[in-house]
């Protein structure tokens, strides 16, 4: 089981957004991933270094590159909050 995968919930541990939860939307390469807060918190869709993320055990079923509406729907269906 890879620690950083599409759909994995993670906490940002570095930078001004530290402490915010995000969802991994795409794995760019071994060092960077695309994350989003899906409009549920102030984290916009952006590229992040995997060293700045701490993965959580929760995961939602989304497709690679899913838009924010699909991520938000998957989070609501799974009963997971990003706040």
Swiss-Prot record:
SUPFAM superfamilies registered for this protein in UniProt: Translation proteins SH3-like domain
InterPro entries, A to Z: KOW, Rib_uL2_dom2, Ribosomal_eL14, Ribosomal_eL14_arc, Ribosomal_eL14_KOW, Translation_prot_SH3-like_sf
GO MF entries: RNA binding; structural constituent of ribosome
Gene Ontology biological-process entries: ribosomal large subunit biogenesis; translation
Keyword terms of this UniProt record: Ribonucleoprotein, Ribosomal protein
CC terms in the record's Gene Ontology section: cytosolic large ribosomal subunit
PANTHER family: 60S RIBOSOMAL PROTEIN L14 (PTHR11127), LARGE RIBOSOMAL SUBUNIT PROTEIN EL14 (PTHR11127:SF2)
Family stated for the protein in its record: Belongs to the eukaryotic ribosomal protein eL14 family.
Stated name of the protein: Large ribosomal subunit protein eL14
Species of the source: Thermococcus onnurineus (strain NA1)
């Amino acid at each position: 089981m890879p620690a950083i995968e599409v759909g994995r919930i993670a906490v940002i541990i570095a930078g001004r957004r530290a402490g915010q939860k995000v969802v991994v939307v795409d794995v760019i390469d071994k060092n960077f991933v695309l994350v989003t807060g899906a409009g549920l918190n102030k984290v916009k869709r952006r590229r992040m270094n995997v060293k700045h993320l701490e993965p959580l055990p929760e995961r939602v079923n989304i497709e690679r590159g899913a838009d924010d509406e699909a991520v938000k729907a998957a989070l609501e269906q799974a009963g997971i909050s990003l706040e």
